[in-house]
Each structure stands twice: as structure tokens, then as C-alpha cells.
Amino acid sequence: MPKRKPVIAELPAPEEIDFGALAREYIDSLVDLIVVLGPTASGKTRYAVQLAGEINACAALGLFEGCPGRMTDPAPVNGAEIISADSRQVYKGMDIGTGKDLSEYGDIPYHLIDILPAGAQYNVFRFQQDFRRVWADIRSRGMVPILCGGTGMYINAVTAGYDFTSKVSLSAGRGPSEAEGLPRHPYFIGTLVSREVRNERIDRRLDARLKEGMVEEIRGLLDSGAPAETLISYGLEYKYVTLYLQGQLSYEDMREKLATAIHQFAKRQMTWFRGMERSGVRIHWVEV
């Protein structure tokens, strides 16, 4: 008989994450990657930073030393670091438009942010390669890797074992050579917010970013040689502000169309994550 897909409620129910149990699962190698995902304006970065801070605090107090587990060779826990899964935060100089507030990370180390100049080409295949290297390095130092972002395809590429040579996913029965360098036991946490609250946050955040100089940031990228067509291809803020700077939209039209586009984008992100659940991925949703 074909495998029955799980029944997914229209809205996920929030949970309370048992941090101690999650830590024990990591030490026992039942978890080898924590994933914090969610739509834009859902508070996922803040949650990931808070989680990493809790892990760091416990490690500093030595609470993980001698932690009882089932494994004879438990995974060490010296702290936590964050790997970004955002397709646009990889670019230098694209800060306000991508919500790249590096001060939010505090003293938590982060990776795969500001690794390329704006206008450069980057894709899911390169992300998977970069993730392999960073994930292995973090774990080799006894740190807990936390993947945080809203780019669903990037998240799937490293947690479902996408094989870009054959264009198929290796999530089912992948062998050691196929999955080499990728996590086998990810633990998914989703940041949950209602559509109404999310859209209100998006609108407030957009107005704040416009006041903070988002238009000037994108004008500077164009002046520095970033091709307009490339910025437009990045979508959302970079698309509509570039069109405004080219004289194709009024300021009012730019703001209105951009807000609508971000609302729709957040909805598509949530649809992607619910689709992951329908395919069998267990996401633990939390209210932030």
C-alpha cells in the first residue's frame, strides 16, 4: 500500500521545546543539526540567537559535562553557532533590504552572511557546498550548529540531501556516499505567528527600513556597478526600489506594491514549510 501522507492542520499548534531533552538528543547524536525556520517577520533570527545563547550559557557552566546519555562516544557541546539560510544575506552591502541586523547576533558566531559582493551569482548548489564545509567545521570544534533562515529550498538542500548531479532528492534511503557531509538527524523548529500579526509586522518593518535609508542603500549598489537587472532578480525590496530609482514606479506605488509582494512572499514561505510537513518532516512550532 502507498504510504499515507500525514494530515496537516490548517494552522500548526504551538509547542514548548524541552531544551534539556533536545540537548541530550544532540549529545546522543540523535540530533546533528538544529533548524530554525519560518516566514519573514516571524522572529526566527531572534529565536535562534536566544537558543544559541542558552546553549552557550549551559556550556560555560559545564552543565553538559558528564551529561547522561545512551552513546558511549557522546557528541561534545562547547557552545553554538548559527548558519544563515537566507539567499540574499550572502551579499555584502545588501543590509537594510534583507534585514541583516548583525548586531542582533551579539556574541554568537554566524556563517554564510556577507560572503559575496552584490551582483554576484549564487545558487542552492553553491549553498549546499558552503554548508557542508561550515557544518563540518562547527561540529569539529564541539559546537552545536543552528541553521536559521526562510529560504526553503536551501534548507531542503541540506536536510533532504539534494543530489544536484541527478536532479533528485536523496531523502529516502540515501547511502553514506550520497549523504556525505550532510546532516542525517535534523531537528526542525518553526517560528509561528498569525497572518494578521505577520502582515502588521511586515508593514511596520518596511516603513522603518525606508526611513533607515533602504532607498539610498540600493542607489549606492547601483552607483557601485551592481547591474540593475541583477538587483531586480533578487526580488522584493531590491526589485521594487530599483524600479522606483529607474523612474518606472512612483514612491507611493513602490511602497504599496512592495508591501503586497512581501505579504505574498511570506505566505509562500509558510506554504513551503507546511509542504515539508506533508512530506513527512516533523516541525516543532513555537510562538515567538
Where are these regions (language model features)?
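Catalytic core of IPPT-family isopentenyl/dimethylallyl transferases
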Residues: 1-76, 184-288
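N-terminal phosphate/diphosphate-binding loop that engages ATP/GTP or pyrophosphate donors
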Residues: 10-34, 45-146, 154-168
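Gly/Ser/Thr-rich helix-start
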Residues: 39, 98-100, 150-153, 162, ...
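Conserved, function-defining core regions and hallmark residues within catalytic/recognition domains
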Residues: 86, 150, 269
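Short, conserved catalytic or adaptor-binding loops enriched in Gly and charged residues
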Residues: 102-107, 178-182, 276-278
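Noncatalytic linker/hinge segments flanking ATPase motor cores
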Residues: 121-131, 152-157, 228-235, 261, ...
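Short, surface-exposed helix-loop/turn micro-motifs enriched in polar/charged residues
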Residues: 123, 143-147, 230-233, 254
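Phosphate/Mg2+-binding loops and adjacent switch elements
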Residues: 137-203, 207-211
